[in-house]
Amino acid sequence: MTLPAIDPRRTALLVMDYQGGILDRLGDAEALLSCAADAIAVVRGRGGQIGYVRVAFDDADYDAVPPHSRFASIGPEMHSHSPATAIHDAVAPEPGDITVRKTRVGAFSTTDLDQQLRDRGITTLILAGISTSGVVLSTVRDAADRDYQVLVLADGCADPVPGVHEFLTEKIFPRQASVITGAELKDLLSGSGDVDE
């Protein structure tokens, strides 16, 4: 596929739910962390914005969750002060990065992420996250509805359910997003726009 050249200054890489307590559910996450760290370096090096999204609850958030919500059973391990909710050190935020804390699945839900992106003139989003069927799927849909150009960094996403990641990246996401690899990201940000499918 051929994509339009991407202006790094109007692009943000969203690193979503790269938290210790979530990464632990995947087993071996080294390749995923390496891909995300490389993507962060590429985007940052080209003048793009990095954004971090993490799921974590404070006491008031726990009280506000309705009993029918899937989040009603979340325990203290997901409290905002728990080490399990911290962004992994291998991909840790730096000063000037966007950071938001959410209490639902999608990156835009319960956050001011959209406003922070718009304030910085961001029009293109590159998504990396865990899980593909959770935060990534929800954010692809929401970001497309908000008229962002959306790219999914396939090797920067993972899902604990076998086959789900492949199905979403091959069959569902291409309806609203371009699916790329970490190797293709550098070329896109340099302006060539050519991605072999």
Q: Which residues fall in each region the model found?
A:
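Short acidic, Gly/Ser-rich segments with clustered Asp/Glu that frequently serve as metal-coordination loops
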Residues: Q19-D24
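Acidic-leg catalytic submotif of subtilisin-like serine proteases
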Residues: A12-Y18
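Active-site loop/turn elements of alpha/beta-hydrolase fold enzymes
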Residues: Y18, V55-F57, D155
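…and closely analogous acidic/polar surface helices at protein-protein or active-site interfaces
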Residues: L26-V43
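Active-site-adjacent betaalpha module
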Residues: M1-A12, D38-R46, F71-E197
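Short, flexible, mixed-charge acidic loops at enzyme active sites
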Residues: D63-S69
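Von Willebrand factor
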Residues: V43-Y62
